[in-house]
C-alpha cells in the first residue's frame, strides 16, 4: 500500500502550493473568490476557475466583475474561500497619474509607498473577513521587500493586520527558481536579496 504524499511547507512550484492548500484547507477543488484574478495564472494547470473572478483592470479577459478588492459588493458571510495575490513592489510609477494614486498603482503592478501597500492590504483583508463565513479560508500570497533602505516584513505585517478577524491556519514558503523582481538600484548591497515568497492561510474567526 502506497503512503500518501506528504505535504511540505516549502516548494519551488506555486502550483504544488496551491494544490496543497486546496487539499488541506479548502472545501471543494478551487476557491470561491479570487480577489486579484489578473490573467488567471493560478488556474493554468488544471485548478478549476473560481466562481467569482475579480480584478480592478477592466481590460482583462475572463473576469466576472471589475471591482476593487477592498469593495467587492458580495454579500456578507456568503463564501467559504478567498485567494488574494496583490502586487508587492513599491516605487512603481508606471502609468500612474500621481505618486499617491493607489487605485492606479494596484492596476499596474505596484505601489509608490509602503503606506499605500499597507492600506490596500489591510482594507482587502477587512473586506475578505466581511464576505467569508465563519471558519472560511483566506489565502494570501506575499513577499517581503526592502523599501526606503529598510526591510519591510510584509508577511509579519499581514499576520498583525489580520489578527482581529482571522486565525493563522498554515504557512507555506515558495523558493524562487529564477531572479525575483526588485528595484533597480546601484550601490552597496545592504540586505540579503529576497528569493522566496509566502503563502499565508488564514481562517475566519467571528469573535
Could you tell me what each predicted segment is?
Residues 1-207:
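Class I S-adenosyl-L-methionine-dependent methyltransferase catalytic core
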Amino acid at each position: 500500500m502506497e503512503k500518501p504524499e506528504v505535504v511540505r511547507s516549502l516548494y519551488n512550484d506555486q502550483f504544488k502550493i496551491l494544490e496543497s492548500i486546496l487539499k488541506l484547507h479548502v472545501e471543494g477543488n478551487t476557491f470561491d473568490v479570487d480577489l486579484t484574478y489578473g490573467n488567471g495564472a493560478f488556474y493554468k494547470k488544471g485548478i478549476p476557475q473560481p466562481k467569482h473572478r475579480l480584478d480592478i483592470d477592466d481590460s482583462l479577459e475572463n473576469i466576472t466583475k471589475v471591482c476593487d478588492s477592498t469593495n467587492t459588493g458580495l454579500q456578507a458571510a456568503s463564501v467559504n474561500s478567498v485567494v488574494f495575490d496583490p502586487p508587492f513592489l513599491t516605487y512603481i510609477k508606471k502609468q500612474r497619474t500621481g505618486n499617491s494614486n493607489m487605485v492606479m498603482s494596484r492596476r499596474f503592478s505596484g505601489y509608490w509607498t509602503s503606506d499605500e501597500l499597507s492600506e490596500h492590504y489591510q482594507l482587502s483583508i477587512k473586506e475578505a473577513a466581511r464576505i467569508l463565513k465563519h471558519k472560511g479560508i483566506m489565502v494570501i500570497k506575499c513577499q517581503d521587500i526592502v523599501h526606503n533602505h529598510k526591510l519591510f516584513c510584509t508577511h509579519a505585517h499581514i499576520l498583525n493586520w489580520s489578527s482581529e478577524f482571522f486565525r493563522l491556519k498554515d504557512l507555506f514558503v515558495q523558493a524562487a527558481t529564477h531572479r525575483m523582481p526588485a528595484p533597480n538600484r546601484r550601490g552597496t548591497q545592504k540586505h540579503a536579496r529576497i528569493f522566496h515568497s509566502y503563502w499565508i492561510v488564514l481562517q475566519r474567526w467571528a469573535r
